[in-house]
């Protein structure tokens, strides 16, 4: 028989917000007597944008911008109803994207 598991994937641009959110989730899960694994860091995705500096000529003069998307995974094994309720009521920062799979 397979045990029930919750997998939480977090994405964000800032690592400090991401780690604080992971710590809040792990703290609430351990407070309700659930076993957690993580935060497991996934590869950071870099997007680089190349833009011409001048509007008309000078193609050799370019500027590069990049965004980095950091990802973490947290697994919660054998969650109970209080764990799920406390995770739903948890308040996380606005810059963090959360995907929850049961």
Swiss-Prot record:
One Gene Ontology term of the molecular function aspect: tRNA binding
Pfam family, one: Ribosomal_S10
GO CC annotations, alphabetized: chloroplast; ribonucleoprotein complex; ribosome
Classification via InterPro entries: Ribosomal_uS10, Ribosomal_uS10_CS, Ribosomal_uS10_dom, Ribosomal_uS10_dom_sf
Annotated GO biological process: translation
Main location: plastid
PROSITE patterns: RIBOSOMAL_S10
Gene3D superfamilies cross-referenced by the UniProt entry: Ribosomal protein S10 domain (3.30.70.600)
Subcellular localization(s) per the UniProt record: Plastid, Chloroplast
Assigned keywords, A-Z: Chloroplast, Plastid, Ribonucleoprotein, Ribosomal protein
Reported function: Involved in the binding of tRNA to the ribosomes.
Family, as annotated: Belongs to the universal ribosomal protein uS10 family.
The protein's assembly and partners: Part of the 30S ribosomal subunit.
Protein name: Small ribosomal subunit protein uS10c
Organism: Guillardia theta (Cryptophyte)
């Amino acid at each position: 028989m397979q045990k029930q598991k919750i997998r939480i994937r977090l994405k964000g641009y800032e690592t400090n917000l991401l780690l604080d959110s992971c710590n809040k989730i792990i703290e609430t899960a351990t407070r309700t007597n659930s076993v957690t694994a993580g935060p497991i860091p996934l590869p950071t995705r870099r997007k680089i944008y190349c833009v011409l500096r001048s509007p008309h000529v000078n193609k050799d003069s370019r500027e590069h911008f990049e965004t980095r998307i950091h990802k973490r995974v947290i697994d919660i094994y054998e969650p109970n109803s209080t764990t799920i309720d406390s995770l739903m009521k948890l308040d996380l920062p606005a810059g963090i994207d959360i995907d929850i799979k049961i």
